[in-house]
Amino acid sequence: MVNLDKGLLKIIKDESLEDYFIKANFGLEKENVRVTESGNLALTPHPKAFGDREKNAYIKTDFSESQLEMVTPVCNTLEEVYSFICNLNKVVSLEIMKNGEFLWPQSNPPILPREEEIPIAKLSNREDELYRENLSYKYGKKKQVISGIHYNFSFKEEFIKLLYKELKVEKDFREFKDDIYLRMARNFQKYHWLLIYLTGASPVFHESYIEEIKEEGEKLGEDSYYIKDDTSLRNSSYGYKNKKDYYVSYNSIEEYASDIKNLVKDKEIQSIKEYYNPIRLKSLGSEDMLESLLHKGIDYLEVRLLDLDPLSIQGVSKETLYLLHLFMIYTLLKENKEITYKDQEEFFKNHDMVALKGRNEEAVIYENGVPVLLKDKGREILSEMDEIVEILFSNNEEFKNVIKRALEKINNPHDTISEKLIKDIKEEGYINFHMRLAKEYLNNFKNKEFNLVGYEDLELSTQILILDAIKRGIEFNIMDRLENFISLSDGEKVEYVKQATKTSKDSYITALIMENKLVTKDILRENNIRVPKGKDYDNIDEAKKDFRLFKDEKIVIKPKSTNFGLGISIFPGEYSREDYDKAVEIAFREDSSILIEEFMTGKEYRFLVIGEEVVGILHREPANVIGNGESTIEELVSEKNKDPLRGKGYKTPLEKIKLGEIEEMFLKNQGLSFKSIPKNGEKIYLRENSNISTGGDSIDFTDKIHPSYKEVALKSAKAVKALICGVDMVIDNIEEEAKEKNHGIIELNFNPAIHIHCFPYKGENRKAGEKILDLLFN
């Protein structure tokens, strides 16, 4: 604890500020170039599906048209920011795959064409394009397409205010806050070489990279080179660095701004954007960063040294994120000293040495001009971090694991990311290795396409809508997780959405009409749309008494005002008084009023209407199993429910099949039970109603059905003035034109699920989430 600030550490401990200290704001900005299947830089334009890159909040371009930049919002936890970068990676990967492209998982470039063929990003602001053109003249395009990750960090304001109160300093709050971040930035500059060693992941480069650098390196395989003992080419003089090491003071904001302004005035750099220091001071809400810093102060720190980690599917591991968090805490608790020009010279020297020679067993770093073995100094820093954790965060397993893993890498360079990459690339080849990973990661995303990572508790339709919003750069906010209530903003207006399809576009009365099946039928009938005949009841005894009216009819018994097929019983054939009474009781469990109506012949189809369009049409096949001649129905259901597409609570494309009263009664009417053993290949239905919510299968019929039925669906939606609704229609023959007696509307749904149209059991994704966004924002 020799060089830790014992006074500050004591105050945080004595005043029980640990819980405030560990809370922070986190953000990530991640770059990847797009590549073809052969590992060549993709020369295609930025995908149109991502909309205007300058307005998209999450998906932009960096230097090159081929270089994507993914930006998370400010997140409250590392788990949250990690989940968000997972979702961005998935959204981007699944979109560019349509053009046969992949995200290149390495900071160093793939197979590059000639300099002049690398496309600069096409932007609306000519100054932004000119800035990039000047970079290409100065550094070369091949260096500019090196990619990496920026890690944005700030403490919660409440922690800084509590610390300000406890320390009783004689300065105003803004100055105190700025001093905290300046202190951290200075210590970061001094010790960041350790992060390069621990996270460096760009030791090898392709033969198509810069010719002069190849001459400095050694051949590793048929298509690649490396600098012996290097950890991060990107952080070295051969990578993404300024031409010179510029001295910029971090002793005050005024000195910081003045030094950078002088670099611009002397034409050393074009603007602060070209100041490629491993850490930069950042202020919110202004185009002119330096003026904003001077007038508003520091809001957060931007860490710029992270390589893409090819061994992590997201390009960065949780371990690295927790390491950085602990390191930022460490920089505040280290001694508070101003740094001189001579200090910075030493920091630059250590930076370059670790980037190019860090894996050498005898590697040294310099401290006050004295060489010290890297491994010895690394252990000392990690020991201090361990003391901090033991004093303040003794129950934090993530921090403890980070220190343990870091020590392993310090003690054995073979455990570093860079060493592992060299070994794997030597065995497989530079392009083959990275393309294998790129394809593996894409397949992983494809297998979990419908999930919004970190938000799996939301209904699947809501998850899909948010994923589509992310693709367009429409910002979202979860307002009530249990209710699936979100807000969406495109920067110009805000839309509130509940359960994916309840929006401002439909009035309250429209929802009430569709909620009430009796009123819905009356309105449709008034508009000359065929609906089933029947009666409504609000008294269970009256309903049971009328058994004699229906006993020879095919009927449906259902609640008047429920969704998702709850409480519905269907009798297409003979049924007993006991079965009838039980169905009436089941319906009354779900509502105070029920309907008993004729059962219409034909197959049932769900039409999804959004705006003036029928977006998708599904036939929902009732819950069923296919026999194998050995297993019981109960066992077959259990096996079918193991499908990863099946789950509970509308969080997967298909719902698990239930074995309840309704299923038992339906099987009984077929002379079967849960213990019956169907023949090999025999299909057994467990329900008459075909809702996905009760275990049904979804089969897309959008392009197979006669267009006249789409007109009927649109007419039905217009009759109740609905812009979003599900129309349940029974049709005798889908190839035959709609006529008076060959179809009928059995229900309108005011909150239709969209996931069944996006991930049908059979058929194509109808992009219902995108259609909702079109309705809300176009």
From Swiss-Prot:
Residues that bind ATP: 548-606
Gene transcribed to yield this protein: gshAB
Record-listed E.C. numbers: 6.3.2.2, 6.3.2.3
SS bonds (residue pairs): none
Record-level GO cellular component terms: cytosol
Binding positions (Mg(2+) 1): D728, E747
SUPFAM superfamilies associated with the record: Glutamine synthetase/guanido kinase (SSF55931), Glutathione synthetase ATP-binding domain-like (SSF56059)
Pathway: Sulfur metabolism; glutathione biosynthesis; glutathione from L-cysteine and L-glutamate: step 1/2; Sulfur metabolism; glutathione biosynthesis; glutathione from L-cysteine and L-glutamate: step 2/2
Entry note: cofactor: Binds 2 magnesium or manganese ions per subunit.
Family assignment from sequence similarity: In the N-terminal section; belongs to the glutamate--cysteine ligase type 1 family. Type 2 subfamily.
The keyword Magnesium is assigned to this record: yes
Positions of the UniProt region annotated as Glutamate--cysteine ligase: 1-354
GO MF annotations in UniProt: ATP binding; glutamate-cysteine ligase activity; glutathione synthase activity; metal ion binding
Uppermost EC category: ligase
Domain ATP-grasp, residue spans: 521-777
Subunit structure: Monomer.
Catalysed transformations (reactions): L-cysteine + L-glutamate + ATP = gamma-L-glutamyl-L-cysteine + ADP + phosphate + H(+); gamma-L-glutamyl-L-cysteine + glycine + ATP = glutathione + ADP + phosphate + H(+)
Sequence intervals crossing the membrane: none
HAMAP family: Glut_biosynth (MF_00782)
Protein name: Glutathione biosynthesis bifunctional protein GshAB
Source organism of the structure: Clostridium perfringens (strain 13 / Type A)
Pfam families the record matches: ATP-grasp_6, Glu_cys_ligase
Gene3D superfamilies: 3.30.590.20, ATP-grasp fold, A domain (3.30.1490.20), ATP-grasp fold, B domain (3.30.470.20)
Record-listed Mn(2+) 1 binding positions: D728, E747
Function: Synthesizes glutathione from L-glutamate and L-cysteine via gamma-L-glutamyl-L-cysteine.
